[in-house]
C-alpha cells in the first residue's frame, strides 16, 4: 500500500459540490460518494478535518444583494454550513467513520463548540472533524475558514475539492475552449492574476503560513485519495 504524502489534511468542500447536478440542496448520491472517499483516506491513518460551504442552501452575498443586512445574511449562510456538516457527519457515521462536528457559533444541542485543542485531540484519535459555521464572523468566507483552521491545527495541506472544474485555469474552461490548466502556481500568482482559486483573505493566510493547496475535482471517485498520496492531479498552489 502506498504511503500518504500528507498526515493531516483539511478537505474544503463547496456547498455546490454536495448539490451535484441538481444545483440546490443535498444530493444523497453525491454526499455518499464524498463520505466514501473520506473513508478511503481515513483508513490510510490520515487525520482528516473538513470544512463545508453552504452555497447549495444559502449565500450571504445574495442576501445582501436582495437588500438584507450583510451580517444577518452571512449568519444565515453559517447556519447552512451546519446543515451540510450534519448531513456529512451522518453519511460518514453510516459507513463506520467516527465523526465530530464543531461549530464556531455555539449550538450545544447540535454539535460541539470549536475548541482547537479538542479538535486536535479528536484528529489524533483518528476521528474526522467537521468545522461548521465558518469562522463565526460575517464577511469571512468558508475558504478563509479552511485556511484559518488549517493554520490552527497545523495541517500539512488544504485539499480544495471542486465539483465543476479539475484545477485552476487561465480562463473559464466552460466558456473558453482554449483555456489552459496550471499544474503549479504560487499564491502571489493567484493574487496578482485574480485567479478564482479562493478569495484574497484566504490566499494571503495560506501564503503567510506556508500551507500548500491542491485544487481538484471531487466528482471523479478516488481523487481525494490520489491527492493525499501525492499523485499529480489538479493544480498545486504554494509559496510566494
Swiss-Prot record:
Give this protein's Gene Ontology molecular function annotations. ATP binding; UMP kinase activity
**Where is the region Involved in allosteric activation by GTP?**
20-25
GO terms of biological process kind: 'de novo' CTP biosynthetic process; UDP biosynthetic process
Q: How is its activity regulated?
A: Allosterically activated by GTP. Inhibited by UTP.
Task: Indicate where this protein resides in the cell.
Answer: Cytoplasm
- Spell out the InterPro entries in the cross-references: AceGlu_kinase-like_sf (IPR036393), Asp/Glu/Uridylate_kinase (IPR001048), Uridylate_kinase (IPR011817), Uridylate_kinase_bac (IPR015963)
Q: Where does UMP bind?
A: 54, 74, 135-142
Residues bound to ATP are 12-15, 55, 59, 163, 169, 172
Q: Which domain of life is it from?
A: Bacteria
Protein EC: 2.7.4.22
What reactions does this protein catalyze?
A: UMP + ATP = UDP + ADP
Instruction: Please name the SUPFAM superfamilies in this protein's record.
Output: Carbamate kinase-like
User: What is any one of the record's Gene Ontology cellular component terms?
Assistant: cytoplasm
Tagged with keyword Cytoplasm: yes
Q: Keywords on this record?
A: Allosteric enzyme, ATP-binding, Cytoplasm, Kinase, Nucleotide-binding, Pyrimidine biosynthesis, Transferase
Q: In which pathway does it act?
A: Pyrimidine metabolism; CTP biosynthesis via de novo pathway; UDP from UMP (UMPK route): step 1/1
Output the Pfam families linked to this UniProt entry.
Answer: AA_kinase (PF00696)
Q: Which family does it belong to?
A: Belongs to the UMP kinase family.
Q: What does this protein do?
A: Catalyzes the reversible phosphorylation of UMP to UDP.
Q: Which PANTHER family match?
A: URIDYLATE KINASE (PTHR42833), URIDYLATE KINASE PUMPKIN, CHLOROPLASTIC (PTHR42833:SF4)
How does the record describe its quaternary structure?
A: Homohexamer.
* Protein name per Swiss-Prot or TrEMBL: Uridylate kinase
Amino acid at each position: 500500500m502506498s504511503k500518504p504524502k500528507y498526515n493531516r489534511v483539511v478537505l474544503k468542500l463547496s456547498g455546490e459540490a454536495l448539490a451535484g447536478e441538481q444545483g440546490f440542496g443535498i444530493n444523497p448520491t453525491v454526499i455518499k460518494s464524498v463520505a466514501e472517499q473520506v473513508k478511503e483516506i481515513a483508513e490510510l491513518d490520515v487525520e482528516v478535518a473538513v470544512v463545508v460551504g453552504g452555497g447549495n442552501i444559502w449565500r450571504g452575498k445574495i442576501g445582501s444583494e436582495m437588500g438584507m443586512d450583510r451580517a444577518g445574511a452571512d449568519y444565515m449562510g453559517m447556519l447552512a454550513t451546519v446543515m451540510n456538516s450534519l448531513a456529512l457527519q451522518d453519511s460518514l457515521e453510516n459507513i463506520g467513520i467516527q465523526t465530530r462536528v464543531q461549530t464556531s457559533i455555539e449550538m450545544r444541542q447540535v454539535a460541539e463548540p470549536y475548541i482547537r485543542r479538542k479538535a486536535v485531540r479528536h484528529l489524533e484519535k483518528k476521528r474526522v472533524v467537521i468545522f461548521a459555521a465558518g469562522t463565526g464572523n460575517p464577511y469571512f468566507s468558508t475558504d478563509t475558514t479552511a485556511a484559518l483552521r488549517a493554520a490552527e491545527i497545523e495541517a500539512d495541506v488544504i485539499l480544495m475539492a471542486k465539483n465543476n472544474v479539475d484545477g485552476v485555469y487561465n480562463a473559464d474552461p466552460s466558456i473558453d475552449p482554449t483555456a489552459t490548466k496550471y499544474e503549479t502556481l504560487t499564491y502571489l500568482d493567484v493574487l496578482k492574476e485574480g485567479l478564482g482559486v479562493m478569495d484574497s483573505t484566504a490566499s494571503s493566510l495560506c501564503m503567510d503560513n506556508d500551507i500548500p493547496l491542491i485544487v481538484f475535482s471531487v466528482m471523479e471517485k478516488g481523487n481525494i485519495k490520489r491527492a493525499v498520496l501525492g499523485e499529480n492531479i489538479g493544480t498545486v498552489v504554494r509559496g510566494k
